[in-house]
Amino acid sequence: MNAPLVFAGYGITAPEYHYDDYKGLDATGRIVIVLRHEPQENDDKSVFEGRQLTPHAELASKATSAKNHGAVAMIVVNDLGNHPGDPDELLRLNGISGSQEMSITIIQVKPAIIDEWLKPSGHTPDDLRQQIDKDLSNHSFALDPAAHVAMTVDIERIHRPVANVVGLLPGIDPALADQYIIVGAHYDHLGLGQQHSLAPREVGQVHHGADDNASGTSGVLELADAFSHFPRRPRHSIIFVCFAGEELGPLWSAYFANHPPFPIKQTVAMINMDMIGRVSKNKLYVSGTGTSPGLQKLVQDANHVLNFDISFSSSGYGASDHTSFTVKEIPVLFFFSGLHSDYHKPSDTSDKIDAVDGARVVELVANVVQGLDALKEKPQYVKVAEPAHSGTGGGGGYGPYFGSIPDFAEVEHGVKFSDVRDGSPAAKAGLKAGDILIEFDEKKVDNLYDFTYILRAHKPGDKVTVTVLRGTEKITREVTLEVRK
């Protein structure tokens, strides 16, 4: 590829904010140079939702915008002036769009090189950034037409077929057999950890995924076997399905929900098991109970003898396959035994699975399925109010390292910690599992989204004051944030 260059500011067209880097700029057939992130990101009063990055900051969004404006490639440059002290690192761009192809070439170039390219114009990327950030004015322009960039990117995308594995147990009641209870779990994991590994130094080693999610997959197989051998067959039909592609986003469950083998509205409910093999202290997490009246009571009744300490959440959304059915307005229940330090690491191995408690979880799910099967009418879907969510900056992660693991149980205000990683900034400050974070850097924290955005506004080395509730006691500590690894 050989094409002329244009500078396109942050590469954002956002009519809702009355902002357009491409206004008056002809990018057709050209390579666009864009800054990372978005304008005024350190300004609480920015029209771009203050310090909370919007979806426009995502590299995938910038690439889509560049393509829509006719560009043939996009060069990304770090906006170092907004992030003093951050390393000028080149990003790994292979995961910015998940499994989707962007249909445009994206590379990153260091600011020092862009400085040389812009020198004839009398500008640098940082002084242009400052001018844009000052008043959101447009400073896009075409470079000298004689200046071309030739680039060769050698990418081989290998496509291999993968499949959901689906089984059907027909119901015996003629009036109910055309209604379906779905019991599912994802069977994929991370392979060698090239994407999403939380052990970057061990990328290339087998990430076993015993808990995530051989445990849930085993649960589906056990339930299929059990229900097919029960003396009394279910009245409703039961679909048992093991999904592929969950670790890339709930892609294959979404495909199933979009191309169901039966009318999707004939679904009674969808039950998802993801990581059910590491029950600790008899604690189990069940979410989705707000997606239909009576679901929480149904689970409580099913738990009467097993007596798990269940933490309920009403939300039907989450980072697993049940979300694909929530968006179709299907009642869902998600069973989860909690995060642990082996999550997304090679150390998630079978010797750490608690098979006894895992079997108890499967028994609980069996009881729930029987409870659903006993219903005379399909449960009514209820849309649960979700907190507002904004996008994250592509490649930006969640900012500096803090070290808490969230407890996904609902609390009235704040973020409850299910654990605190040993040696982390949070642990060094004396924070503990069970603490509820209510303030971070003197800013109120109502939910995990608040915490994510506030944390991302900081950088490694910052000293921040945090306040937690420990029982009824308010405790304030100073935490020194570190580099996320």
Where does each model-flagged region fall?
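Metal-dependent peptidase/peptidase-like ectodomains
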Residues: 1, 23, 102-129, 232, ...
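Soluble metallo-hydrolase cores and metallopeptidase-like ectodomains found primarily
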Residues: 1-24, 99-209, 222-225, 229-235, ...
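Protease-associated
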Residues: 1-64, 155-157, 170, 394-396, ...
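Terminal peptide-recognition signature
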Residues: 6, 27, 66, 110, ...
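Second-shell loop/turn segments in exported
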Residues: 7, 17-22, 45-63, 100-107, ...
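Acidic/histidine-rich catalytic neighborhood of metal-dependent amide-processing enzymes
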Residues: 50-55, 61, 82, 176, ...
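His/Asp/Glu-rich mid-to-C-terminal helical/loop segments that flank catalytic regions of hydrolases
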Residues: 218-221, 225, 229, 341-389
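C-terminal recognition in membrane/secretory proteostasis and scaffolding
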Residues: 346, 373-485
